[in-house]
Amino acid sequence: KELGINMLLTPIFTPPLDTAVGGERTTVQLIDIVQDADGSYKFDWSRLKRWCDLCLRNGIKYLEIPHLFTQWGAKAAPTVDGKNIKKFGWHTPALDSSYQSFLKQFLPELQSKLIEFGYDRDHVFFHISDEPGMDCLESYKAARESVKESLKGWQVVDALSEYSFYEKGIVQHPIVSSNHISVFLKNKVPQPWVYYCCGQSVTVPNRFFAMPSWRNRIDVSSWN
């Protein structure tokens, strides 16, 4: 709260970010998931409730939900561990019927619980896939379309460097890397969000130890 941060990434399942193909992060999901013999799922939301209570007490107004598909093009499902097995992961294509069936049950229940726990659709952000490139345009479109109805009325944003995704209406609310923001500003994209991470090291500010202090002035360079 003191730093002005009011949104927090909420690991409902392990975030599929910055992992090599076939690799994965340590499982950190908040929600326990059990699949019954008939293929339906049961969810334990108790840790999510505890998380939301903690966030509300500490001034977190918005929750960010991990990407529903893997980074750089939405070609696979993220890691979703159940009680005893890894159910979905790199071995699961994004449009696999079993994963799609899971999402169709999971997302409505998740949304209902988020509202119950104090975070309505105006205070939750969903993601499809992080930083899709042109070589992944079709897979991203297909993944986005597969959850379109489930996310209807909810906010969906994605990190983006390729302007054509916005131009074609595929990503309607881009969060643009600072070293690619120029084309978005030039084309007067309304209220663009900007981000920086480890990739923004040349010609744009960042906060690496080796940089002179004048290159740390991120707020100044982001002001439009």
Language-model features, listed with the residues they occupy:
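Short, hydrophobic beta-strand segments that form beta-sheet elements in well-ordered domains
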Residues: G153-L160, V171-N179
